[in-house]
Curated annotation (Swiss-Prot):
GO terms for biological process: DNA-templated transcription; symbiont-mediated perturbation of host cell cycle G1/S transition checkpoint; symbiont-mediated suppression of host innate immune response; symbiont-mediated suppression of host type I interferon-mediated signaling pathway. This is Protein E7. Belongs to the papillomaviridae E7 protein family. GO terms for cellular component: host cell cytoplasm; host cell nucleus. The keyword Signal does not apply. It comes from the Viruses. Highly phosphorylated. It comes from Human papillomavirus type 34. A motif (LXCXE motif) lies at residues 23-27. Pfam families: E7. HAMAP family: PPV_E7. Keywords: Activator, DNA-binding, Early protein, G1/S host cell cycle checkpoint dysregulation by virus, Host cytoplasm, Host nucleus, Host-virus interaction, Inhibition of host innate immune response by virus, Inhibition of host interferon signaling pathway by virus, Interferon antiviral system evasion, Metal-binding, Modulation of host cell cycle by virus, Oncogene, Transcription, Transcription regulation, Viral immunoevasion, Zinc, Zinc-finger. A zinc finger (unnamed) spans 57-93.
Amino acid sequence: MHGKKPSVQDIVLDLKPTTETDLTCYESLDNSEDEDETDSHLERQAEQAWYRIVTDCSRCQSTVCLTIESTHADLLVLEDLLMGALKIVCPNCSRRL
């Protein structure tokens, strides 16, 4: 722009880049197979957790404590079994069987 006000002659309609810019990324990634195995192992470990189950003996009604290591999904399956036909028996009652 020349002067205080823009004019039509100052506007350039035919614009072309002055230099060609290579936008290709030539970066290469390292082999990540080892990382994938490590990550999946940590995920499997994270899935497993310790749970303490406190319930009553189905015969004498005494308190029975169980500690299990399980995934949350498998814990829900066990919960369904305990709410159904599966019964827990205390050590004293199991000796009398």
